[in-house]
Curated annotation (Swiss-Prot):
It comes from the Eukaryota. It comes from Pan troglodytes. This is Patr class I histocompatibility antigen, alpha chain E. One of its GO terms (cellular component) is external side of plasma membrane. The chain crosses the membrane at residues 306-329. SMART domains: IGc1. Residues 112-203 are annotated as: Alpha-2. Preferably binds to a peptide derived from the signal sequence of most HLA-A, -B, -C and -G molecules. Residues 206-294 form the Ig-like C1-type domain. Belongs to the MHC class I family.
């Protein structure tokens, strides 16, 4: 199934200004999956400010257009959406050519389905200025080509990627991308933060508790829950007698709750009867100070936690991983700062 291969990543971020608390980043994820015998490849493009998806394009939609995914983007005029739609459609066509070219690089037949991914974005520092940029490309779920931290050179993972690296160097692609990341990306991130500040800049502290799950007569699992928090960055750790405890622990990835907030849990296996020696420590910027939790037998929830677990299992089947990467060639988009994300381009000559 095509949908199963379209992976979305919730972005990390860094601080903006002294007046805007929290972490902030702008990231775009583009994924194309070939469908032999079924027409054009499926192409999906999504944009995130921090942990919030704010735009989306899907060429399988009845009327393929870039559309808002956050209420604060609905105020944008038709000129913005027309421009972003054209750019997304152009990128979809470039991805189609890229898939064919990569298939040739790896000597693959036309019968199989292949996936091309591209991720790029920028982070801001505490002073509101550019802190770092990134761009990654992947083919069939594996790293292909990555722009290094200096934004001046590339890391190619194999001989096929080295072909792309040479072409990129000849076209001064790193220089073009660096200009976009350090300037245009930062400018648009500031604009989006201003437009969505009531949502993006708020803090929602986690609702926390610890549950107890017997494994046998000798062992039990303590699970520390953090629910309904925003932004997504959070730290859950277990300690035994005040010391860090990592043995027999399990930590799930932070997951969206579906209402704009996030969920996470961390579990530890403990000897029965020694539960009170273990404490869960929660750190989140929405909390005035870190929390320390213990299991409380008298207030152990029963039925409610079943619904929570079921919800997390369902979310785990939907949010299956991270998109990293995707197009091989890109040239600086015409119009410069007119676009909020850089346009991918490709030449299949070679």
């Amino acid at each position: 199934m095509v949908d199963g291969t379209l992976l979305l990543l919730l972005s990390e971020a860094l601080a903006l200004t002294q007046t805007w608390a929290g972490s902030h980043s702008l990231k775009y994820f583009h994924t194309s999956v070939s469908r032999p015998g079924r027409g054009e490849p499926r192409f999906i493009s999504v944009g995130y400010v921090d942990d919030t998806q704010f735009v989306r394009f899907d060429n399988d939609a009845a009327s393929p257009r870039m559309v808002p995914r956050a209420p604060w983007m609905e105020q944008e005029g038709s000129e913005y959406w027309d421009r972003e739609t054209r750019s997304a459609r152009d990128t979809a066509q470039i991805f189609r050519v890229n898939l064919r070219t990569l298939r040739g690089y790896y000597n693959q037949s036309e019968a199989g389905s292949h996936t091309l991914q591209w991720m790029h974005g920028c982070d801001l520092g505490p002073d509101g200025r550019f802190l770092r940029g990134y761009e990654q490309f992947a083919y069939d779920g594996k790293d292909y080509l990555t722009l290094n931290e200096d934004l001046r050179s590339w890391t190619a993972v194999d001989t096929a990627a080295q072909i792309s690296e040479r072409k990129s160097n000849d076209a001064c692609e790193a220089e073009h991308q660096r200009a976009y990341l350090e300037d245009t990306c930062v400018e648009w991130l500031h604009k989006y933060l201003e437009k969505g500040k009531e949502t993006l800049l708020h803090l929602e502290p986690p609702k926390t508790h610890v549950t107890h799950h017997p494994i046998s007569d000798h062992e039990a699992t303590l699970r520390c829950w953090a629910l309904g928090f925003y932004p997504a960055e959070i730290t859950l750790t277990w300690q035994q007698d005040g010391e860090g405890h990592t043995q027999d622990t399990e930590l799930v990835d932070t997951r969206p709750a579906g209402d704009g907030t996030f969920q996470k849990w961390a579990a530890v296996v403990v000897p029965s009867g020694e539960e009170q020696r273990y404490t869960c420590h929660v750190q989140h910027e929405g909390l005035p100070e870190p929390l320390t939790l213990r299991w409380k037998p008298a207030s152990q929830p029963t039925i409610p936690i079943v619904g929570i677990i079921a919800g997390l299992v369902l979310l785990g089947s939907v949010v299956s991983g991270a998109v990293v990467a995707a197009v091989m060639w890109r040239k600086k988009s015409s119009g410069g700062k007119g676009r909020s994300y850089s346009k991918a381009e490709w030449s299949d000559s070679a």
